[in-house]
Amino acid sequence: MEKRSFLVILLFMVLNLAGISQSKSFYDFKVKTLEGEDFDLASLKGKKVMVVNTASKCGFTPQYKDLEALYEQYKDVLVIIGFPANNFLHQEPGTASEIRNFCTTNYGVTFPMMAKISVKGSDMHPLYKWLTSKKENGVKDSSVKWNFQKYLIDENGKLVNVVYSSEKPNSDKILSWITSK
């Protein structure tokens, strides 16, 4: 009887741990566009995705130009998603319409831009909690250091790498990732 109870408890523990260790996928999230529409990340299955926290008044803001060029060149295999955030020195103070106008007028941005969110702190958006926590993404812990940090997601919705702001969108590292099979 004791042996049977032990086996039942052991089986319960194993099944419970298996459930805990399963990571969510990038595709499990839904976000809002700058226009307030729902955007289901599952619609991006089969493509690589670069998630970038953006800001209009940052030294890295000119990266919008390279991000747009990359998006235009590789849009068959890559989607870039911008998430405006005001977490660093209040460098994204604009409203949704101001952000859209800024991105379109100054950089011709056509890649998807999402609603302004928080990428750190107690009000961090759930997607960024997933991106920054190994416990959630199953790959690595990171923290968002500054605007224009890039999270690379593979075609299966798994986090692959984090690329910091100083790395340009068209760097060899990023281009190699995009073109790899």
State the predicted function of each range:
Residues 20-42, 125-126:
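N-terminal "domain-start" segment that seeds a small globular fold
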Residues 129, 134-181:
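Thiol-/selenol-based redox modules, centered on thioredoxin-like
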Residues 25-26, 97-146:
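Short, internal strand/loop/helix patches
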Residues 33, 53-57:
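Amphipathic alpha-helical repeat scaffolds
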Residues 47-48, 57, 61-85, 104-107:
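Conserved helix-turn-beta segment immediately C-terminal to the redox Cys motif
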Residues 77-94, 109-121:
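Thiol-based oxidoreductase modules, predominantly thioredoxin-like and allied folds used
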